[in-house]
Structures are given as structure tokens and as C-alpha cells.
């Protein structure tokens, strides 16, 4: 393998290794975009990594009233877990504690898929026997079941069940090697904006960016993951460092999506956006994280992402 350049920036001839995950989507609506976003922001908090948070979540899109089941402003949220049962547990907890509790919200299924997850059908028990089931047609005329749960500002309307998809992928990634922190952060921010514009893809870390990239295991017994020392600039003098002398900071983006194709397109968009402005911000190189191809079956080779994203 030989490295190559894109927009004058070195790109390592490597691949990002990603994993099969369970994924779902919900639509949260409210009377105003502000309150729909408040609910979505709270629900997707503490959801950067499945390992430490139980789920990975993010906001996929803001929706106009024409795009939602009840004709109000909305937000589409994506949620990912290791497997369907863990995903169900996180979905119920987060909707119950963050969407049910928020003034004015309603909650609907946001994606079709083969696996059913009871949502309103489980949360209805909060209604203490006063919740009422109702069937209403969707935009295609298909009857769907909802629960009207009495709450102090009226009622919480929640779809009886949502769906989990087959083919969701977690862990697409890019690493940006830069000279200075402020400049590299700008590059990563531009990459995030491009990546999250792809429908069905989210970047779950703070602002879409992670500084604490990890490797599997560690020196301490029982650690599932520890700092990726090969990419820590303060350890450049040690054997095993993967960083060139001029690199002073590394920032990573991680992408989860409902399909493998969405991960690839999100990575492509991020790679091109970052390298287009990289030279003026001291970007040294772009690479990706993998485990030698031994853990995840999805391999996204950076060489395959050279073609520009569709306009």
C-alpha cells in the first residue's frame, strides 16, 4: 500500500473498521422547533459510546411540519446499540425520561424495519390505567396504533411500537493529524458539518468530534479500552508512535448510520471537506482507525472515497 494525496493533503492508504449494530429512529414533534430540539438534545445526551453509555445517539434531521405525522415541527433522532434488547432498553429509558417529560412533545416511529420494539405500548403504564389506544392513518393511509397518555399539560401521544433496522453500522471514522489544536479543530468541525449532512448518519461524540481515541484493552486488568497511545502527540518519542514530527494534535470523527452506504458517503463527504481547507489550517494528514480487520466486518478504504461527493 502507498499513501496518496487529496487536495494536496496526505491521506494514508488504510481503512476504517466498523461494526454491525442495532439501530432505530424516532420522530419527536412539538408546537415549536425550539421545544422539539430541546427534547431531542436531552434524549441524545450521554450517548457517545455504546461501551460507556449503553447507546450511541444523535440528531439526524430537523423536520418541517410537512414532514411529520402530526403536522408540527419535529426532529428525527437515531439511536444505536450493540443488539436489539439493549437498544430497546435504552430507547424506553430515554423516551420515558426525556421525551415524555418534555412539555408538548409527541413521539412517532422514524424508520421501517423488521424488528418491532414496543414503545408507547410500554410507556402507557405511566398513565396508571388512564391511557387510551387510538388508531390513525399515516400519510400512506396505513392504520397505526398510538397511545394517548394523560399528563399535566394535556396528553403525550406516542406510537405503540417502532422498528429496528437490519444493516445498521457503527464506527466509521477519520483521524485528522494537525499542527495546532485550534486549526485542527476547525478542520474537524468542517468535516462534521459535511458528514452529518448525509441522511441517516450521525456523529455521536461532542460536536461530532472525539479527542480520546482508544485501542482495545490496556495495561490495567479489566480495561475494555484505553488511550490510543500511537496517536498521542505527547508520546511521539516512544516506540510505536504513528505520528510524524510536525504533528501536534489528532482529532477523530466517528460515524454511525442506518446503512453501510450512508457511513461510506458520510466519510467521503468529511474527507473531501477536510482536505479542501486543510492546507490553510496546517492539516498534516488524514488516516483512519482499524483493528487489522479482525473485529468488524465493514471496511471503508480511504482510497475508495477519492471520488468527490455528489453535488
From Swiss-Prot:
<dbReference type="Pfam" id="PF02741">
    <property type="entry name" value="FTR_C"/>
</dbReference>
<dbReference type="GO" id="GO:0006730">
    <property type="term" value="P:one-carbon metabolic process"/>
</dbReference>
<protein>
    <recommendedName>
        <fullName>Formyltransferase/hydrolase complex subunit D</fullName>
        <ecNumber>2.3.1.101</ecNumber>
    </recommendedName>
</protein>
<comment type="pathway">
    <text>One-carbon metabolism; formaldehyde degradation; formate from formaldehyde (H(4)MPT route): step 4/5.</text>
</comment>
<comment type="function">
    <text>Involved in the transformation of 5-formyl tetrahydromethanopterin (5-formyl-H(4)MPT) to methanofuran (MFR) and formate via the intermediate formylmethanofuran (formyl-MFR). Catalyzes the transfer of a formyl group from 5-formyl-H(4)MPT to MFR to produce tetrahydromethanopterin (H(4)MPT) and formyl-MFR, which is then hydrolyzed to formate and MFR.</text>
</comment>
<dbReference type="Pfam" id="PF01913">
    <property type="entry name" value="FTR"/>
</dbReference>
<keyword id="KW-0963">Cytoplasm</keyword>
<dbReference type="InterPro" id="IPR002770">
    <property type="entry name" value="ForMFR_H4MPT_ForTrfase_C"/>
</dbReference>
<dbReference type="InterPro" id="IPR014053">
    <property type="entry name" value="ForMFR_H4MPT_ForTrfase"/>
</dbReference>
<keyword id="KW-0554">One-carbon metabolism</keyword>
<dbReference type="GO" id="GO:0046294">
    <property type="term" value="P:formaldehyde catabolic process"/>
</dbReference>
<dbReference type="GO" id="GO:0030270">
    <property type="term" value="F:formylmethanofuran-tetrahydromethanopterin N-formyltransferase activity"/>
</dbReference>
<dbReference type="InterPro" id="IPR023447">
    <property type="entry name" value="ForMFR_H4MPT_ForTrfase_fd-like"/>
</dbReference>
<keyword id="KW-0808">Transferase</keyword>
<dbReference type="GO" id="GO:0005737">
    <property type="term" value="C:cytoplasm"/>
</dbReference>
<dbReference type="InterPro" id="IPR022667">
    <property type="entry name" value="ForMFR_H4MPT_ForTrfase_N"/>
</dbReference>
<comment type="subunit">
    <text>Homotetramer. Octaheteromer. Part of the formyltransferase/hydrolase complex fhc; composed of FhcA, FhcB, FhcC and FhcD.</text>
</comment>
<comment type="similarity">
    <text>Belongs to the FTR family.</text>
</comment>
<keyword id="KW-0012">Acyltransferase</keyword>
